[in-house]
A protein has these predicted regions:
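Residue-level signal for beta-strand positions within conserved beta-sheet cores that form or flank
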Residues: 13, 52-54, 102, 136
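Residues at the starts of beta-strands that form the adenosine-phosphate
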Residues: 15-16, 105
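Conserved SAM-binding loop of SAM-dependent methyltransferases across substrates and taxa
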Residues: 1-14
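Phosphate- and divalent-cation-binding pockets in alpha/beta enzyme and binding domains
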Residues: 6, 29, 89
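A generic alpha-to-beta junction signature in SAM-dependent methyltransferases
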Residues: 11, 38, 98-100
Length: 163
């Protein structure tokens, strides 16, 4: 999505990228976007997740199962979670992807009723490992209305290295 485009647009900011989706149409769009942002060749058709370049792994995959691949677990400094209807539910299965040898970051989007935001904040904090000392606890920020009763929110969490 747009967050990845912004990150890839910054010189020398992004190293390896892992991107997956279960939806073939979303993967096709991802590959089109990577082609534009990276100015590299990418497949035109979605396929199961694989290494497409030395520093790019992308394709069709269930993100909740990636933690079981020893080549992917524990390697990533940042997670961008853009499944707003399921972010809180799947966070525990994504955390094992983080490289906990140093600080890392999780950014996500959540759809929640405004009255439920404080409970969603608690659920996010519970799902994540200890946060980096001195950084604020993750807290949902309303980005825009999703419907008459629901809000599209975002959060950011700095994760402490494992002891």
């Amino acid at each position: 999505g747009p967050a990845l485009a912004t990150l890839l647009g910054e010189p020398d900011l992004v190293g390896d990228v892992l991107a997956s989706d279960l939806n073939p149409d979303a993967v096709e769009m991802l590959l089109d976007n990577l082609r534009r942002w990276d100015r590299k060749e990418y497949p035109s058709e979605p396929a199961p997740i694989s290494r497409l370049h030395e520093d790019r792994i992308a394709g069709l995959a269930d993100a909740t199962k990636l933690q079981h691949d020893p080549n992917l677990a524990g390697r990533w400094d940042m997670l961008l979670v853009n499944l707003p209807h399921r972010t809180i539910e799947i966070l525990p299965s994504l955390v094992p992807l983080l490289d906990r040898t140093g600080p890392s970051m999780v950014r996500g989007r959540v759809i929640a009723a405004e009255a439920d935001i404080h409970e969603a904040d608690r659920a996010i904090r519970h799902a994540l490992p200890p946060r980096l000392e001195g950084m604020p606890e993750p807290s949902l920020r309303i980005k825009r209305d999703y419907s008459s009763t629901l809000r599209l929110c975002s959060f950011e969490a700095w994760i402490a290295p494992a002891p």
